[in-house]
């Protein structure tokens, strides 16, 4: 790393401890200080629903943004679950319209989820997204726990979608993409209310399953009638 950039990074690392906006780039800044410039944030959406695919997205911001030039129009980027649907849509459109942002969005369908389980399917979606990034990342910051199958150096961050702009952006791209698909699938499979609950195990969705039975996009390995799986009924991912 050139001396000038090293001084600049050290300055921003110091400021980041006091400034909430820069604090959400502290993980990226630490890597930049180590000479890493292509840092991908990766996250998934749709781990908990009873229906539909799981999505993942990966995002690389230009290092200049990390070093203090982050656009004002993107400063609301956060954990997608903490944002309104309207705000997510605005930020999604802003992210994908920026030529400086390198991103990829992928999905793994419910049949594969049933074959390999939701954790492996989520990791597969993440790895597929990372593999599509051009240029490839030098380091990945991951929401949650370490992904054993990942081929890149990685830093897992608990609640990373709220702690990192890069992961937060990935969470928005993944969630909006999945939500849009579930709205479309509501037309293909009417009666289940996919446009409203996006496949999560709401009382309305469970009642529809009881009345209509499962449809082709339901995850057969997720039983909505097993009380031992309460985590499936909350929008936790």
Question: Which role does the model predict for each range below?
Answer:
Residues 1-237:
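RNase H-like, Mg2+-dependent phosphodiesterase core
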């Amino acid at each position: 790393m050139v001396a000038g950039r090293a001084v600049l990074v050290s300055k921003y690392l110091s400021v980041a401890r006091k400034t909430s906006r820069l604090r959400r780039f502290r993980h990226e800044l630490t890597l930049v200080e180590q000479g890493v410039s292509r840092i991908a944030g990766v996250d998934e959406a749709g781990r908990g629903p009873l229906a539909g695919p799981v999505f993942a997205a990966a995002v690389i911001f230009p290092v200049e943004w990390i070093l203090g030039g982050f656009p004002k129009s993107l400063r609301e980027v956060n954990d997608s679950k903490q944002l309104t649907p309207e705000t997510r849509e605005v930020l999604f459109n802003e992210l994908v319209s920026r030529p400086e942002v390198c991103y990829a969005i992928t999905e793994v369908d419910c049949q594969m989820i049933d074959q390999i389980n939701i954790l492996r399917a989520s990791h597969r979606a993440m790895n597929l997204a990372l593999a599509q990034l051009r240029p490839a990342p030098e380091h990945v910051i991951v929401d949650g726990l370490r992904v054993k199958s990942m081929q890149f150096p990685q830093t897992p961050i608990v609640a990373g979608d709220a702690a990192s702009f890069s992961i937060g952006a990935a969470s928005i791209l993944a969630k909006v993409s999945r939500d849009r698909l579930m709205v479309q699938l509501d037309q293909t499979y009417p009666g289940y209310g996919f446009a409203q609950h996006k496949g999560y195990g709401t009382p309305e969705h469970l009642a529809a399953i009881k009345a209509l039975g499962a449809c082709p996009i339901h995850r057969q390995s997720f039983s909505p009638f097993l009380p031992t799986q309460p985590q499936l009924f909350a929008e936790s991912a």
